[in-house]
Amino acid sequence: MAKFPDKRARVCLFFRTLFRMRYKVTLVNVECLNQPGSKLVWPTHMAVIDPMLVFAELYKYPLQPFVDERFFANGVFRSILKVFDSISVPNLRKSRNGLEQAKQLNNLCLASLQAGKTVIFYPSGHCTSDGKESLGGRNMAHTMAQIMPDETRVIGVKIRGLWGSCTSRYGRKGTPPIFPTMFTNLWKLFVPRRKVTMEFEDITDMVRSWKGLEKTEFNHNLEEYYNSKGIDEPKTR
């Protein structure tokens, strides 16, 4: 298992201690992250809290995340993100140079994999609005499947138990702001902990078998994998 700086460990363990007051997290088959070599980690995105939960629970693993550029605008966030060697992701839809920036992101991801790192990004790029994982026209997962090094393993992560929570889009038109939402729901620390499951699976062979597919079909197959167990029953407490 790879080692990482003490500062990263302290940040992760701080949030893990905090989150475990509210969430009872079960990790299934997390051992697949112990495989040698570079890895791509592709989780589902059920709520705005799940990236923080993933990092808190995987404190033993040196994950390098791709993070929305908006979070780098905040000084506190930026200092934390630097600890994790985070890569800023611009809003490609609003950028005049979207295509070129997408290529740069792909190249950065490839360089990290070639250096043996474990890169994590969310193929859908957004929180689900209906409990299902939907990639739409997203490009990055499809592109990385074409160009990732031969030794890279792809790890799928299905997260269950967060749909319907205050940090999900259940019953909302948009994505809730993470910290204001957490602060206004502090009273939930005094109710039974919410059960969350993170199921890890090595899907490398499956992803490689889709390598020659067009983006639309590739994304559809990945959606079917993510949604194979159906939609979580929404729980609001």
Q: Across the structure, where does each feature detected by a protein language model lie?
A:
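Alpha-helical membrane-targeting segments
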Residues: M1-R22, A73-D85, S165-R194
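A cross-family acyltransferase "interaction/gating" segment
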Residues: S129-G212
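Residue-level preference for the first positions of well-ordered beta-strands
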Residues: S38-L40, G116-I120, R153
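Short, charged beta->alpha transition segments
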Residues: G75-F77, L105-L113
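Catalytic core of membrane glycerolipid acyltransferases/transacylases, capturing the structured
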Residues: N34-E100
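Short, well-ordered beta-to-alpha junction loops that form the rim of enzyme active sites
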Residues: T44, Y122-H126, I159
